[in-house]
Amino acid sequence: MTPKIFIILLTSFWLINSSQLRASSFIGETITIGLTASLSGKFREAGTQQLKGVKMWRDDINERGALLGKRVKLIVQDDHSIAEDAAEIYETFILKDKVDLLLGPYSSDITNAVAKVTDKFNFPLLAIAASASSIWDKRNKPYLFGTYVQSDQLMTPVIKLAAAKNLRRIAIAYANTRYTNSIAQGARRVAQENNMDVIFYEMFNTTNDFREYVERLAETKPEIIIVGAYLEDSIQFVKALKQHKVSPKMLVFSGSIDTDEFRSALGNDVEAVLSAVQWSQSQRLPGAYDFSFRYKQKNKVYPSYQAAGGYAAGQILEAAVRLSGSLSKKDLQEQLLKLKFRSLFGHYRVDSNGQQIGKKAYLMQWQDGERRLVMPKDLTNHTIRLFNIK
């Protein structure tokens, strides 16, 4: 054997064994990620979907070979859709569980409460589902990083489309939450900028009876109705519209209606209902088709945008950790501030305050019992259908 061949074999032997030693040294080591999920309470459906997305990312990354040589472990607690409960749990994650990383809960109100805790400990928090711009107003510390389109911009594309179609009379109904308030304020601003008449602008409290509310709305004879609401209120709202035979040309909800539960509750009455969403299953969006296929195989239903958001948050956090090369809170914060990344969800890019500025919103419509992407035009062949209560 020549000296050259011997050196090559010896080097190969050293590389193989050193890699095995490195791998074996991480056996039993994990990176822990703490998060709450709304597994009960008013956000149960969306919160459950979101957690399924996060868990799917965890399974994928562990199958690929882990993160920084360690397996990823989720520590999950039910926050019962209550902001105060979530805030207490996140403090426990930091002080008692000593988690390495954090992902945010579901909803703007709960995230806002949690961010006050994570700010106190200078702990970076990637918000999975928080879009109310007021969360980022007057923040002194850039430790909260958004992934959603800001809610006050969510209705901009559909309102501009309605104005282009000469629809002028707009009604805006919204639930009493930080997220839906922001949607309503943004919708009113954009409508006024496009010379539309805001003929109805009224908040409602969560209720199973919208009859009196819808009666007042019906008197204004709107051509387009914008509704800022979560799933259960959205279902009851459509039922009340049908009962009073209110039939605008466009009926648009803020989200949470792209689920099988919405379709099951309303049957054919979902036809032509629009929803401004953060993500769509369109095959023209990178990774969307593969994710949808695998998610349905695993969960027996197609993913909602909340599920996609959960998965994408994992992708973004993974990218930031890999690029920083450590679990240092300071390094992670700096990386999340400067990161430009394209996830399953779209473009991630934040301003100096951590507010999302890189992502765009999509418009989905129920057509023939199926979810169809109808905007933006460059991503779909489907056209918007006018709404008609039957």
Annotate each predicted stretch with a short phrase.
Residues 1-5:
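Positively charged n-region of N-terminal signal peptides that target proteins for export
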Residues 6-10, 21-390:
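Extracytosolic ligand-binding ectodomains
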